[in-house]
């Protein structure tokens, strides 16, 4: 808990890194209850002094009281993850055959995923958390500013004629930074009731203008009767949350 530029580590084995991010080397680890002195902040990481005269970087959210239920640090608990519920506000997105709006279901999914990841200790930021309009360029800008470890944009597909297409596709734009993330997520959406169509290149602004590992997931066809029955069910957001959590766990384990 931060008090007068000091904090207490609330979980065991929190990594001390050489720089402000997961890409930097692990130099040490602290035990639960360790007092640290905050010297400076960058990208939601803290440069701290601990054990008298040792220094290093620690994820700021791992010293917050709300994460005290964690028992140990993991790569997900060190990660900053931006979730992007597609559309919102005046932008309804695609429509189901009965006029249900895509924006409603992207937000439901994003909130479920956020809850799952936060329970694992991750620092999660949503580009919107209510029915509001957020411009396309503002969405990747959030990930770039935060130096996010992953950006996931949630959408639902639509075909020109209803009931003619089905499936989930995970899109990437920058192969070098994002293909591994797309593959890890795709490998886990196979557990979902809507079949996976695999990964593919996608020229979408929110991932094209994104310098961070980023994907756009089309989680089914909103104008397909069978897909929409699943999309609109109460359990689908939870199922997606479990799949995304598993995919991110695999992805971060291999970084």
Predicted regions and their residues:
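Short beta-strand segments
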Residues: 26, 54-56
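SH3/SH3-like beta-barrel fold
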Residues: 33, 46-50, 58
């Amino acid at each position: 808990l931060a008090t007068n530029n000091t904090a207490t580590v609330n979980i065991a084995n929190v990594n001390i890194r050489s720089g402000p991010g997961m890409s930097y080397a692990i130099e040490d680890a602290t035990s639960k209850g360790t007092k640290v002195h905050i010297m400076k902040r960058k990208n939601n990481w803290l440069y701290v002094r601990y054990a008298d005269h040792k220094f290093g970087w620690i994820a700021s959210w791992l010293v917050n009281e709300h994460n005290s239920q964690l028992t140990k640090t993991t790569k997900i608990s060190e990660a900053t993850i931006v979730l992007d519920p597609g559309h919102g506000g005046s932008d309804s997105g695609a429509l189901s055959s009965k006029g249900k709006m895509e924006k409603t279901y992207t937000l439901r999914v994003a909130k479920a995923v956020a809850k799952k990841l936060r329970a694992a200790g991750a620092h999660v930021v949503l580009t919107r958390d209510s029915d509001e309009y957020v411009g396309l360029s503002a969405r990747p800008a959030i990930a770039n500013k935060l130096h996010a470890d992953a950006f996931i944009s949630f959408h639902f597909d639509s075909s020109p004629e209803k009931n003619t297409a089905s499936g989930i596709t995970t899109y990437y734009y920058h192969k070098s930074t994002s293909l591994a993330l797309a593959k890890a997520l795709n490998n886990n959406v196979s557990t979902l009731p809507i079949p996976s169509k695999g990964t593919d290149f996608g020229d979408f602004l929110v991932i094209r203008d994104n310098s961070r590992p980023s994907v756009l997931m089309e989680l089914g066809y909103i104008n397909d009767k069978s897909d929409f029955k699943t999309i609109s069910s109460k359990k689908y957001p939870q199922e997606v949350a479990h799949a995304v959590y598993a995919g991110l766990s695999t992805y971060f384990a291999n970084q």
